Amino acid sequence: MTGWLGRRALRTIHEFRTRLARYHLQHARAAKAALAADPLVETAVLRHAQEHSLTHADVRRRVEQYVDEIVPQLNILSYYKIGYTLAKIVLNLLYRVTVDYQDEAALERIPKRDVVVYAMNHRSNVDYVVVAYVLAYGAHVSYAVGEWARVWPLEYVFKSFGSYFIRRGFREPLYHTVLEQYVRLITKNGVTQGFFPEGRLSRDGRLGPPKLGLLDYVCRTVLDPAFDRDIWFVPVAINFDRVLEDRALIRELVDERDRPRRLAQLWTVATYVGSNAVRLVTGRLKRYGRAAVNFGTPISLKQWLASAPGVLDLPKERRLPELEKLAALLMERIGAIVPVTPVPLAAAALLSFEQTVIPKAAVLERMEQLRDRLGNVNAKVVRGGTRIPEVWDRAWRMLRMRRLVVEEGDGLIVLPRGRPLLEFYANSIAHLLPIRGPRVPFHKTHETETDLPTLKREKPR
């Protein structure tokens, strides 16, 4: 790094005390050249050309397209001076951000030279921003980002933040060879990464089954004889009192064709930020409750492989079922630390009665019972020592603002349009609650005036 911008970038790294791989300080041209010249990529090029009767030059051009699409160029000033500042403003306009650790000492014991990979549940497109924001002082995270963000200006923004794009559901072997070699390249160079094992946003609020592609790519880096580090997977659980895209996700669960366009999703977030900015100026700011992040106990890949020797040497059809055990362990660890914020707790309590009109006193009593049960399984209840009436008041502000529940006398009425959203939020903690209500589709029938149907369990993809 030379010149004024280079010196400013180095000062920023020291200011944030960030964990940044030297690999990120080189120009993207070097990474692209290394990836294009990879022997395994060349082998895949020859195979693809032969199988599809294409010239070597034609396939090479396709590889160059994939490389340009995948490889980012981190701009440190963009990430920290622009990205961090905007994240701080946006998140504080929308939420109260809470961070907790299951074993902070274990995270601090990870050797500095080892590779850290954050594995997160996927609740909202805001997940990227929340986790990057809370980790900014100490670590830069390179995300695997879906094709939804490949639209101007998001594509440029994410690439300047050091994130790389992946085509979900794209099965071409040539593409996956390029992607795998890129993931192995950044892992070998110690880049801190973040990915979502579920591979997509949760449409019904529940934790989804893990996908194995990126996990396999990261793990197989250890097969390189020159790679002498350990890889640590850190479980990260995220939850919100309000997911900005919740209604769109529910509709998409019912009909995949009802998925909003990329610009529509961006416009939704921008609308919420803009409206809250106006409220801030006019003194009427109404945040959307909590955005909570919990970090779990890290898992050492070396230790896991010691109990499953030779797994990574197996052919793919035998290797992936074994790696599924590691993925299941990650999801179990993530599920155990999902933050219990006021709205999911209140939603679970309301729906556990399976009726429309419920005495408020009974709801508060049920919330107390549920919180006790959550405590018994060591669940991460946000501000667990707060009195239940105060927890209800925080949840009630959101439920009333969104017209999900109304109060009449000493009773609470669950509105027809509110029930699917209550299910969506209760589902986020359903795996922690051994009670009848939030573990199954809550209501077999619905009032006819609702425009959102009862949530059915999302099918694995």
Residue map of PLM features:
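Membrane-interfacial terminal anchoring regions of lipid-handling membrane enzymes
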Residues: 1-461
